[in-house]
Amino acid sequence: MSTATATSMKLTAEQESENARINAENERLRKQARAKRTISLTLSYVALALVTFLMIFPLIIVVIVSFTPNAVTQTWPPKIIPSAWTLDNYTSLFQRLPIGRELLNTIVFAGAVTIISVFFDSLAAYGLSRVDFKGRGILLAVLIATMMIPAMALLIPVYKLLGSMGLVNSYLGIIIPRMADVGGIFLLRQFFISIPKDLDNAARIDGAGEFRIFAQIILPNAVPAILTVGMFNFMGNWNDLLWPLIMTSKPETRTITAGLAMLTGHGSSVTPYGVTDEP
């Protein structure tokens, strides 16, 4: 065997040994990375599970208390699992409140406000973001400034105005003041600005008017923002208590939140957590 052949075989063996070492090192690093990912995912899932539990724990307590006699809810120390269970609270609730009617009123109120406000908010946002006119910046500043006015300061004036129009205890009375929302206008405007204006110009060249551009170009591209505004509108009005409580005093127009509020207090210093307590 020649010296060159021996040298070549030696180099080949050394190369194979080096490749094996590199492969082993890479495999070790991959296993180490997989272990780190597994630990990271496990900790993330544990943290998410803990946060989820903390978020739903109050709801669980509310459900448990609804099946607990009021006398048991006042005991100390409190118990997560009560010693007694009852359905009397639900029986009394359906006897004392027209739950079906109030639930329907809430759906009508929250749904109508959501649809109407999203429509008007998107129209206003389109004008403030895509249409050039004098005073646009001033108008936007004035709208944003109105957000600094406390809502409580407007309750009595708005109530008197609607009362003079005969809209107390009516769907229109609770819906009309919520038909537009400055926060929704601002959010949609900021999203509309991110849509390229080249789309508008191309549509105008094809003969499209402003409303067609708004309906066929802007709205389809702004679905995420519109859904976000709609979701916040619906949830906010569904959970609203003060406005429906002020504007409605009859079951025909009262929402579910206002109806449930009628069950608490009764002039007592102790809240009757079980609705079986009579006023």
Model-derived segments and their meaning:
Residues 1-48, 272-273, 277-278:
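Transmembrane alpha-helical segments of polytopic membrane transport and secretion proteins
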Residues 22, 41-279:
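A structural signal for multi-pass alpha-helical bundles of membrane permease subunits
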